[in-house]
Amino acid sequence: MNPDVNAISPAEARRRFRDGLVTPTAGWSAGYAQANLIAVPRDYAFDLMLFAQRNPKPCPVLDVLEPGQYAGPLLAGGDIRTDIPAYRIYVDGELVTEVADATEYWTDDLVAFLIGCSFSFEAALLDSGVPVRHIEEDVNVPMYRTDRPCRSAGRIGGPLVVSMRPLPPEQVADAVRITSRYPSVHGTPVHVGDPAGLGIAHLSAPDYGDAVTIRPGEIPVFWACGVTPQAAVMQSRPPLAIGHAPGHMLITDLRDSELVVP
């Protein structure tokens, strides 16, 4: 990880992505919250909002934009269609392409949801000496589809997706304590230990992102992940949906400290 990206402003990060830089965003703009994007047609927006309300761990909503709107208070002067490093375009639930600029696919009917991202609490983990392996190895965080169904809402339903960070056993409690103060970006882990408990067969083969090294004696710790709405879109098959490429987030102007609860 280039240490310079840790210190740049969210606006500068978004400018670089707008100019065509494609990279995972873990470790970027320390101190600022990152967000997942999922945009669906207005006709599906209520179902998606209800899905998020019923599944707050994987889908903590930071903001919802008006139909067709592509700017908002979390990205001053920004453009949601261009300021994320990479986007996934879904048609009838099928992933049809991944692009660095979603402008040509955006319609006046799309409603954009910005969902909290666990990258937002990683600076707090690192500040407390808790390792974050994908940052150490300069790769994307590993993410997995589980066999746990989310609560459905109208036409929207699908499996829970989780991110994984391996930790020494003596630091698991610290990670739980630290992340418990960030409920708006997934909060505490949903599972600790045996991945089979989530229906995950092989940690070395994530469904999204990259595999990371798990050292002898370390325990895999799983957090709910904001890719969950994209898994629901693939199952629910709306005519069009646009999401961030997993691990390639919107870096917002919202400070991590504003998300901390006592």
Swiss-Prot record:
Molecular function GO labels: lyase activity
Family of this protein: Belongs to the D-glutamate cyclase family.
InterPro entries from the UniProt entry: D-Glu_cyclase (IPR009906), Putative_hydro-lyase (IPR038021), UPF0317 (IPR016938)
Organism, as annotated: Mycolicibacterium gilvum (strain PYR-GCK)
Keywords: Lyase
The protein, known as: Putative hydro-lyase Mflv_5194
Entries under NCBIfam families matching the protein: PRK05463.1
EC number: 4.2.1.-
Entries under SUPFAM superfamilies matching the protein: PSTPO5379-like
Transmembrane portions of the chain: none
Taxonomic lineage of the native organism: Bacteria, Bacillati, Actinomycetota, Actinomycetes, Mycobacteriales
